[in-house]
């Protein structure tokens, strides 16, 4: 089973179109580095663009970098021809809880290893693969939200919640949402 999982992960990342960026960089630098096509920014405007195909995010920061799986919902905003925010759902379709939890745990593990810290560990702790978290996530009215930040520069909001998927009406499906931008939630005080 482990060999199959490793092979799947390697294949999933090997040839996947990607958007490779650093928050705040010039839009054209991101476009030239990325293998997924995305339209140019509009000079002197604020707006967003969507990759022309499913793509994964490769966050290229030398200290805080990380990679996501392929995403169907993926928007990159610009202001003054610079990357100004990222919003995405790092999945192609709503997932079963086990599959969604694997992605969330992988992302959080990457962030920990690269120096990201929880913004509010008491009120918005990391999402854990525990019976308590699974019970909470199964409640359609709850879900889980956690915030991570890189020094005092960038912040990530990660949300995992149950999602009604009409294609799979008899299954519990889950949606992961990820936003990256300037810090908008202050650090929790001790």
What are these regions (language model features)?
Residues 41-44, 49-79, 131-190:
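Long, continuous compositionally biased terminal/linker segments
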Residues 70-143, 184, 190:
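Long, charged/polar, surface-exposed segments that mediate recognition or autoinhibition
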């Amino acid at each position: 089973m482990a060999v199959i999982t490793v092979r799947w992960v390697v294949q999933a990342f090997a040839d996947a179109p990607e958007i490779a960026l650093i928050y705040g960089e010039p839009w054209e630098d991101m476009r030239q580095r990325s293998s997924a096509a995305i339209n140019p920014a509009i000079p002197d405007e604020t707006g967003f663009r969507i990759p022309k195909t499913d793509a994964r995010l490769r966050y290229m920061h030398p200290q805080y970098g990380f990679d996501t799986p392929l995403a169907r919902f993926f928007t990159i905003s610009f202001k003054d021809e610079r990357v100004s925010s990222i919003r995405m759902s790092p999945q192609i379709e709503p997932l079963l809880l086990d599959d969604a939890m694997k992605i969330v745990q992988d992302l959080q593990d990457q962030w920990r290893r690269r120096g990201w810290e929880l913004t509010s560990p008491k009120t918005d702790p990391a999402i854990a693969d525990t019976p308590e978290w699974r019970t909470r996530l199964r409640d359609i009215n709850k879900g889980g939200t956690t915030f991570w930040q890189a020094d005092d520069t960038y912040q990530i909001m990660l949300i995992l919640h149950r999602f009604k998927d009409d294609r799979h009406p008899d299954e519990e499906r889950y949606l992961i949402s990820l936003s990256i931008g300037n810090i908008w939630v202050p650090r929790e005080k001790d």
